[in-house]
Amino acid sequence: MKKIFIPTPLDESIVLPKDVTHHILHVFRHNIEKLITVTGSDNRCGIYQIKDEINGLAQASLIEYIDSPTAMHRTILVQSYLKGEKLEWVLQKATELNVDTVYLVPTSNCVAKYDAKKLQSKYSRWEKIMLEASQQCGRTQLPTLVVGETLSNVLDMESESLKLVAYENEEGYTIKDALKAINSDSTNRDILICIGPEGGFQEKEINDIIECGGQSVTLGNTILRAETAAIAALSMVHYELEL
């Protein structure tokens, strides 16, 4: 069943936006009376039946509300700024790997620079990438994208999480080792993963994360590109927690 998101709360009857209508009826060629799963801006989820198309807008009626699956652990990616397509690729693949929240932060070695104006201009495109990835992979909840915070602020905001930082000089401690701790004591701690930019984290930044209760982890014997590291780390978490 096709899963879609709309920018309004759910109700007994809903009108799908024009772009969603086109996607459902003319790209996927679903017929009137077809059932779809819809998530609204209120994060409620329901099964709807398409009833009609009027002026390019599909009209749908509620069949039943359904519960959205909730994970025991919230997964958080703290991604240093990357250049253009690399960052967009990370956002897309992180969404497919069921990340819950993505923080985009400036760190010392970032090649890409985003001031407030540039962040604002890019934000809607980044959100659209994550929305389309969510619909493609069948998620019922959209991940949250947060920009404009510093690494220090994020660590404070997520102080109760299990904080991990991918570090090329860490030799033995893995994500699997770190997750054993929360699996063994049955806690529902959120899992936060920090990934550096193309130039990696500076040693001071690694130490700052560790001083906030973080742990450096290795992603293997090879040094990965920044965008590869993010997806590798999330894949490891996904495997350990969900498979």
What positions do the PLM features span?
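Structured adenosyl-cofactor binding patch, chiefly the S-adenosyl-L-methionine
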Residues: E203-L243
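RNA substrate-binding interface of SAM-dependent RNA methyltransferases
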Residues: P69-V165
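Active-site/ligand-binding-proximal alpha/beta "capping" segment
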Residues: E158-G200, K204-E205, G214-V217
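Generic structural signal for residues in well-ordered beta-strands
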Residues: A60, L142-V146, S216
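N-terminal positively charged helical leader segments and presequences
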Residues: M1-S68
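Mobile, glycine- and charge-enriched loop segments
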Residues: I36, S61, P69-V78, N183-R189
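Short, ordered loop/turn segments at secondary-structure junctions
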Residues: Y65, T107-N109, N221-T222
